[in-house]
UniProtKB/Swiss-Prot annotation:
Keywords: Acetylation, Elongation factor, Isopeptide bond, Phosphoprotein, Protein biosynthesis, Ubl conjugation
Residues that bear Phosphoserine: 42, 83, 106, 174
A GO cellular component annotation in the UniProt record: endoplasmic reticulum
Residue numbers of Phosphothreonine PTMs: 88
Annotated organism of origin: Mus musculus
Name of the protein in question: Elongation factor 1-beta
Record's comment on post-translational modification: Phosphorylation affects the GDP/GTP exchange rate.
Gene3D superfamilies attached to this UniProt entry: 1.20.1050.130, 3.30.70.60
Glycyl lysine isopeptide (Lys-Gly) (interchain with G-Cter in SUMO2) cross-link site: 147
Region (Disordered): 73-115
Description of how the protein assembles with itself and partners: EF-1 is composed of 4 subunits: alpha, beta (alpha subunit of the eEF1B subcomplex), delta (beta subunit of the eEF1B subcomplex), and gamma (gamma subunit of the eEF1B subcomplex). Interacts with elongation factor EEF1A1.
Name of the gene encoding the protein in the UniProt record: Eef1b
Modification N6-acetyllysine occurs at: 7
Family: Belongs to the EF-1-beta/EF-1-delta family.
Length: 225
């Protein structure tokens, strides 16, 4: 398992593809798995890697809380696609790994059991929370105006970046380009959110993080369903 070398474009592409249908490296909440991979990435992925950049900006917002995130941090080779081998940090990192060898045995098995138990507990909590939810879930329909920098902005790519944002309780709907003047068009896109899971502040933070394409975001309409 792994992402290849996360300090290279090829490794970041693997990460981007892996996150195309995921919000986090593992599970439904930020965890030490995200911290481990985040720390292996040397900086923000390029704007054309929408999924990786969206994930990077989101995990970066947990900088102060990363030590308290759930889970047990493992080596990079424990995460990612099973068909890819981790090669991040070869050389000096390999020497460090040699220094960390435990000549009197290993507690990897114990850590694995602990991680497994933690995952099972989180899954049980998640299922319990789902079971206790009321039959009627409060939802809202939101119409967003996403404005580009100028008339040369690739609006197809901008929309792709916006739709790459995924979250539990968020469903993207129809969209269209609306002229605003001087040859510039804004993206007007509909979404339905579960009120207790997704807010406009979260949407604005993640959409404007694609700063190579997005100048600003406004809520054009907000209706309770």
């Amino acid at each position: 398992m792994g992402f290849g070398d996360l300090k290279t474009p090829a490794g970041l592409q693997v990460l981007n593809d892996y996150l195309a249908d995921k919000s986090y490296i593992e599970g439904y909440v930020p965890s030490q798995a995200d911290v481990a991979v985040f720390e292996a990435v040397s900086g923000p992925p390029p704007a054309d890697l929408c999924h990786a950049l969206r994930w990077y900006n989101h995990i970066k917002s947990y900088e102060k809380e990363k030590a308290s995130l759930p889970g047990v941090k493992k080596s990079l080779g424990k995460y990612g696609p099973s068909s890819v081998e981790d090669t991040t940090g070869s050389g000096a990192a390999d020497a460090k790994d040699d220094d960390d060898i435990d000549l009197f045995g290993s507690d990897d098995e114990e850590e694995s059991e602990e991680a497994k138990k933690l995952r099972e507990e989180r899954l049980a909590q998640y299922e319990s929370k789902k079971a206790k939810k009321p039959a009627v879930v409060a939802k809202s329909s939101i119409l967003l105006d996403v404005k580009p920098w100028d008339d040369e902005t690739d609006m197809t790519k901008l929309e792709e970046c916006v739709r790459s944002i995924q979250a539990d309780g968020l469903v993207w709907g129809s969209s269209k380009l609306v002229p605003v003047g001087y040859g510039i068009k804004k993206l007007q896109i509909q979404c339905v959110v579960e009120d207790d899971k997704v807010g406009t502040d979260m949407l604005e933070e993640q959409i404007t993080a694609f700063e190579d394409y997005v100048q600003s975001m406004d809520v054009a309409a907000f209706n309770k369903i």
